[in-house]
């Protein structure tokens, strides 16, 4: 619509053709509901990438002890005064748990790249919150291989059940006919260790009962933490 015609309509017409066109031009191409959906999905992806939940399909993060502890630590930190001593302690515990999970993931990535999946390793290791056991092609075989990796290698912390997220990755490797090769490489690169060797080589090992105890102390002593905030750190 030309500028002169717009001026004519504004001056002499009672219709709202100009305003309607302007409104149409300003109308968003994507609705708010769609934008909210994309935002939620992006947050879920960031949450999975940051925390590497052992049970990715559990939105409550309560089915496994390690997920439950990490989730409670995150919730407790949200309710703690930023910058306080309690907040810093919680942040250290949270990062310690994340570091252990990242270490396991890095081991898997190294083996995948050694098998030739240089470009595909990240995609193979990505497990979304929508992961479903019903969609797995070889669930029984994948679980058997996961147990083998748990008992016959040092990929995981042998004192805890192996993270379920790697069940989905093994299912993909079975489909690609690379699962047996992966297990063979894992046996070679990460042979099993006894308890003493594991403690020496894994300084980031997580004591879940101790973390829970410290977290409960932080909750019950929240007022004291605010007072301690004014004291100089040692």
Curated annotation (Swiss-Prot):
Main localization category: membrane
InterPro entries assigned to the protein according to its UniProt record, in alphabetical order: Melanoregulin
Disordered: region residues: 215-234
Coiled coil: none
Signal sequence extent: none
Protein name: Melanoregulin
Species for this entry: Danio rerio
One Gene Ontology molecular-function label: phosphatidylinositol binding
């Amino acid at each position: 619509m030309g500028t002169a015609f717009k001026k004519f309509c504004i001056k002499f017409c009672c219709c709202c053709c100009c305003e309607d066109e302007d409104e149409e031009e300003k109308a968003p191409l994507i609705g708010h509901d769609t934008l909210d959906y994309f935002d939620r999905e992006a947050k879920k992806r960031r949450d999975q990438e940051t925390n590497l939940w052992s049970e990715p399909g559990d939105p409550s993060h309560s089915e496994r002890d390690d997920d439950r502890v990490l989730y409670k630590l995150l919730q407790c930190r949200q309710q703690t005064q930023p910058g306080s001593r309690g907040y810093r302690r919680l942040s250290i515990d949270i990062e310690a748990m994340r570091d252990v999970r990242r270490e396991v993931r890095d081991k898997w990535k190294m083996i995948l790249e050694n098998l030739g999946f240089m470009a595909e390793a990240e995609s193979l290791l990505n497990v979304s919150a929508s992961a479903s056991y019903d969609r797995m092609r070889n669930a029984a075989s994948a679980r058997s291989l996961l147990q083998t990796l748990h008992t016959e290698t040092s990929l995981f912390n042998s004192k805890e059940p192996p993270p379920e997220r790697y069940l989905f990755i093994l299912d993909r490797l079975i489909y690609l006919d690379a699962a047996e090769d992966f297990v063979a490489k894992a046996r070679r690169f990460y042979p099993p260790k006894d308890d003493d060797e594991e403690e020496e080589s894994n300084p980031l090992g997580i004591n879940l009962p101790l973390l829970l105890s410290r977290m409960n102390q932080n909750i019950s002593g929240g007022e004291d933490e605010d007072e301690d905030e004014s004291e100089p750190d040692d």
